[in-house]
Amino acid sequence: MNRDSFYPAIACFPLLLMLAGCAPMHETRQALSQQTPAAQVDTALPTALKMVGQTXQWWLEYHDNQLTSLINNALQNAPDMQVAEQRIQLAEAQAKAVATQDGPQIDFSADMERQKMSAEGLMGPFALNDPAAGTTGPWYTNGTFGLTAGWHLDIWGKNRAEVTARLGTVKARAAEREQTRQLLAGSVARLYWEWQTQAALNTVLQQIEKEQNTIIATDRQLYQNGITSSVEGVETDINASKTRQQLNDVAGKMKIIEARLSALTNNQTKSLKLKPVALPKVASQLPDELGYSLLARRADLQAAHWYVESSLSTIDAAKAAFYPDINLMAFLQQDALHLSDLFRHSAQQMGVTAGLTLPIFDSGRLNANLDIAKAESNLSIASYNKAVVEAVNDVARAASQVQTLAEKNQHQAQIERDALRVVGLAQARFNAGIIAGSRVSEARIPALRERANGLLLQGQWLDASIQLTGALGGGYKR
């Protein structure tokens, strides 16, 4: 070994000795692996979430001002959104608190003490009153004031890892807020279109009741003229009573939906005044771009992903705790035994201290903390994998339901067209004077019944499509 390499080796020897003297790290747990869709999760949060909040407002595609207003009110006033927002602020404050530990600290302190010295103690000579010797005991009023500074050197990255873990939690909370936002918007939209479905059904039932009343009036006139018996109109009366009962049921459902919407929008002061609008048309098939790659837009997967990232940083921090801690301290103070001397230049004192803490034996505390961090990380990964599987199942189930209901709506549309042809034939025969007007009403009632069935199927498809939108994280576009 030449002289040029000998001295650097000697200089590094104390560092190697310190590292060798640290508490041993035990590898007792195997890290779990994440599901494949983890690679599809966008890691640009929370910026990406803010973009989703601005551009993926899927409810705007309905072009319904009432629905947009309800969802906006819910997002602004719902208690769930307020809770999610406070969780983000708490996580941000905790991250800032950890980040501040990585920088230098400077404090100012001052104290004054009045004390009587013991003549029999270690400071016994100061208990004497001998001005020639510099003692004026036994009473003294001493004072100290000045600056103290400290800096913990994060050589091994422990504090940086803790900050990264906290920032991961912040991003996870932001993703949870977006998930709450999507769930809230989906709940409001589903209730709103359920109300519109019931409102449309109410209109059809009123038309059925009108046709039934026409038949009842005709039967009564025929009975009064002695043309028919009273038995022939009984079935029509029963059907009319059933229709009125259905109307009452629909009105009750609409009131319940309005109450639930008021609760979601936190609107307890005034009743909702919704106006009926036409239901959106049923799409015959799912769009071509529908795929599991859209799962990356799900906010719950984003949140689970960031909890995993946070747990991995926590492991890094737990590992860094096995290495030595180095602290720098300095002070600049005025210290005097008598207050009258406190502000003299001779009362000034200063110093610099470098401290080293070497974890040699800790009874397994550091390894226990590392095991806890690894177990929590494995739990986060397992939760993420479970969320991925559930997300895939949610999409498959919702997509299948949407496709099935779309096919049912197509079949129902054909049934309604056939029923309308029967009504058209009856109307033509009435115009020709072959049948009475009540027979046209009798032909219209089955067609209206089929129309009511079609509205219910249309509402079910609409509800399923909103669920599919939620399963894809709000990124599915009809």
Curated annotation (Swiss-Prot):
Protein name in UniProt: Putative multidrug resistance outer membrane protein MdtQ
Residues where lipid is bound covalently (N-palmitoyl cysteine): 22
GO annotations of cellular component type: cell outer membrane; membrane
Pfam entry (one): OEP
Transmembrane segments annotated in the record for this chain: none
Main location as per UniProt: membrane
Lipidation (S-diacylglycerol cysteine): 22
This protein's UniProt keywords: Antibiotic resistance, Cell outer membrane, Lipoprotein, Membrane, Palmitate, Signal, Transmembrane, Transmembrane beta strand
Topology with respect to the bilayer: Lipid-anchor
Annotated InterPro entries: OMF (IPR050737), OMP_efflux (IPR003423), RND_efflux_OM_lipoprot_NodT (IPR010131)
PANTHER family in alphabetical order: MULTIDRUG RESISTANCE OUTER MEMBRANE PROTEIN MDTP-RELATED, OUTER MEMBRANE CATION EFFLUX PROTEIN
Species whose genome carries this gene: Escherichia coli (strain K12)
Keyword Signal: yes
Lineage: Bacteria, Pseudomonadati, Pseudomonadota, Gammaproteobacteria, Enterobacterales
GO molecular function list: efflux transmembrane transporter activity; transmembrane transporter activity
Signal peptide segment: 1-21
